[in-house]
Each structure stands twice: as C-alpha cells, then as structure tokens.
Amino acid sequence: MDISIFIPIYGESDRVEKMLTLFANQNVSKEIFVAVDEPTETFSRKIKDLKGENVTFIINSKRNGKANALNHTVGLSSGEVLLFLDSDIDLPDDPEYLKKIIRKMQHTDILDIKKRVIKGQSFLSKMAYYEYLSFNINSWLSSHFMQKCPAVNGSAFAMRRDMFEKVQGFRRVVAEDIDIATRAFLKDSRFAYSQEVEVQNVVYSNWRQWYTQRKRWAVGQALWFKEWYRELANHFIKKPQVFLPGLFFLYPSVAIMFISAVIPSLWMYNSLLIFHCFSQLNSTLPYRFFWFLWQLQMF
C-alpha cells in the first residue's frame, strides 16, 4: 500500500461519509481504518452503508481512547505513509489529494497539513481563525527554515511508518499529537508543511464546547511542557529559531488576539511578526523579509 488512512471516532461523525467518498475516488493504493469508540445506535446502523473496498471499521463498545485506537489500527496496516485525520474535519474535493500527500512524504518524515477556518462574523469564529492562522505560520516557518518542529496539529498530519515505529507510536497522554511530534523531533526527524493540501476545521458554535476544547489543549500543553522541557531546552539553546515558532503554536490565542487588536491590518501584523522574530535570530535574514511577506499571503 502507498498510504494508510486512520480516522478515530468517538460516538458518531457526520463528516466521515463524505471523507470516505472522496478517498474512494483517489487513484492511489490505499487502505482506510475507521476506529469507533462507543458508537451511537444511529451511527451503528449507518456503518453498514459506509463499508467499502479497503475500508475497515473497528468497533469498540467501550472507550479505548484515541492513542490506543490509532496504535491498534496502525498495527493492522501496511502503508509506508500513515495519514491521521480527525473525524470532525472537511476535505476539499481534490481527485489528487492523497497523491499530493504521498509525493510530499517522499522527502520528509512528518507532514503537517494546512488547516483552514472560514472567518465568520462571530467572535468565536474570528478567534478560531487567528488561532489556526498562527498554527499555519508556525508550521510554514519551521518547515521552510529548519525542516524540524517539536509540535504538530493532530487534526490532520502524516508520518512515515519507519519514523512511527522508531518512536513506538502514540502514548496515552492528553496531547498525543504534540507528544509524538516531540519524540520524533528528538529523533532528528524531518518536518514539512504542505500548502498544496488542506483541511477545514470546525468552529464550535457555543462557548461551552469551545471552553471544553481549549481546557483540554491547555492541560495537554502543560503536561507536555512538564515532561519535555529539559530535553527540549538543550536543543533550543543550540537552535533558538526552532523555539520561537513553537511559542505561537502552543499559545496562539494570546499572541494573535493581542497583536491583531493593536494592529488592525492582518497583513501588517504578519509582516511585523516575521520581521521581528527573524531579525533577532540572524542578521543575515532581513534581506529575505520582503520575500516572506509575499509568501505569507498564501496562508
């Protein structure tokens, strides 16, 4: 197999059918594993209609957790490229979606896929937009300048099988995506960011859902930092340019919201942010500043 795709679901998903339809029309050698913990009665009946060629459903009557589900299904797979997708995302209608990922993975160990949020008029929508914008900026900077990054956004990313096995898969931690990316980073993995392919992330419509998600992120990041800060500090002292983009990945809301409130133009904000970070890191970089600005408009 060229690529193995993994979609963990808790309860149910109203987007997985569209994802499976898209993948069925992709002209690559593929296999898809959908692990469902505690499926609802409605979704259990729907699963029968979703089964197709090279699509395997793993049904768990109890909640085993995302890390366990992914590790188990990876063990059943054979693809050299492992693509991990959350069940609450939307994919573009691109007949070469998987082919582009496979091509990009020929030159990297971990691929962070571009996340897009449609900026609506609500405050939550705007806040989520700036959060994911910062994720994309961080990944692009890390990919373009260092080809390394200690974090990844787990809603959509790919990893080579040999690197997955090298770090012994996911661990049962709150932030399993950042954790596996950090362990791969410490194993000197290559990191890349793709603008060719993207996913669209869901923006929660009420404060309770938003708060629950952000609380989980905050706890996960705190526990991650407590476990890894010593080892990462040794690397960051040698290469501080890896650390600065990571700050915006881990704490996007505060940084982005504050600066966007002070500087009304997002284009101007991007310009000042990149110029400030890299002019402090390396005196040879400012000549690339204007080239940076042009690139950032592609976010």
Segments the model singles out, each with a brief description of its role:
Residues 109-136, 172-173, 182-245:
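Catalytic donor/gating beta->alpha subdomain of glycosyltransferases that bind UDP-sugars
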